[in-house]
Amino acid sequence: MNMDRREFLKKAGLGAAVLGIGACAPRVLGDDDAKSRAVPDGKMASHYDGIGLLGYGCMRWPVIEGEDGRSHINQAEVNNLVDYALEHGVNYFDTSPVYLEGDSERATAEALNRHPRGEWLLATKLSNFSDFSYDNSVKMYRKSLEIFKTDHVDYYLLHALSGGDDFKRRFGDTGIMDFLLKERELGHIRNLGFSFHGPDSGFMEMMELHDKYHWDFVQIQMNYVDWTHSGKGNASAEFMYGELDSREIPIIIMEPLRGGRLADLPAALSDVLKAREPKNSLASWAFRFAGSFPRVKCVLSGMTYMNHLQDNLSTFLDFKPLTDEEKELLEITAEQMENYPLVRCTGCQYCMPCPYGINIPAIFKFYNGNVNAGTYVVSKEQKGYAKIRRKYLLEYNKSIPGVRQADHCISCGHCVSACPQKIAIPHELRRIDKYIETLKREDF
């Protein structure tokens, strides 16, 4: 850092807010402020011809409760979102056979197939996690083509690789990689790449395969926290970007908001960013960070609601790369986030279903939301202690049915290997359950 942190934060407008983290008052923050931003006229930002810089992640489509009492994708709303996105220059749609309990591809295809094939780019994945046999993998690939009524996939990904051994087990030894290379040669796969969750060493193993397979693109988790604070077991985005950039491999970015967490910052941190750009959402800072790197081909966002889409469009249709000073401010924000007892969950739901019925993502989301809002009890002497305690316990029971709460975890470990963020899920569930029991007993 070229500047003293206190001096820098003072210049940002609210330095004391960040430095005095423990003093933040209860306050609910989120991306609702996105509603106030108008979508400007203009052309979608782009670093590569033919592809908009903002892409649509199709893992978080809106759902409604059906007559059977279960949640179903709201197809009418998906259609509206897709229409609006295409109208404003979003043309890259990323899905997978396993998203939304296997229904994402169908819903996405139903919306997109109402438009000419040349107007949209399809990105989907070979998500052969449990059965990675040749026959099953070919079946999964052909099923995607069938669902989208197309003879080609624009961007096809080997889904969620962690390194060379994982690649060899799922794609190399099975012979499916030879099949995919032939499909690329025939033009049925226009671009072949992979998405990655794993350590530096695993990423380098995949880079060493570039000379043999010539990756057309790679999808990585990149945001201003994971740039240098990626957490135990995962390569930093800075490292991966550098390796890809040096090989001139285009990059697709996933989790630019870290599962929505960067659109819902603790009050002390959000106040600093709001002081700098009062009219802009917290999410816009994260998207400007992701879109400021020239090797980035597309930044994915799982835009569940129209206000999310409109807010992101207002960022990318009038795109302004971050200044060096703004990058420094976000690095300080990322460092300060380490001081909060948050769970690093992005809500991807790869850990689900839990064999014992625990709603893992919902528990983490509820807990993180209260930490961010300042409604996290530290001691009985805390201002508003009784009200905060009662509210937390009531809303926890209301949000998450008793049989799906953290105290039902038996530490079977079924979820651990599935987590891309390498979260020690049973440990975190025990920690949250212990906190809840402390609230009940008032034993601080």
Task: Please tell me what each predicted stretch does.
Residues 92-99, 190-195, 298-300, 419:
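Short catalytic-loop micro-motif centered on adjacent basic/acidic residues
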Residues 56, 93, 108, 122, ...:
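Conserved, mostly hydrophobic/aromatic
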Residues 56, 95, 124, 155-158, ...:
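Conserved beta-strand positions
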Residues 91, 214, 239-444:
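Structured C-terminal cap/extension of enzyme domains
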Residues 106-116, 208-218, 270-271, 313-319:
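Short, electropositive alpha-helical surface patch
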Residues 64-65, 131-252, 257, 264, ...:
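Glycine/proline-rich, positively charged
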Residues 2-120, 179, 185:
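N-terminal binding-site loop/beta-alpha segment at the start of enzyme catalytic domains
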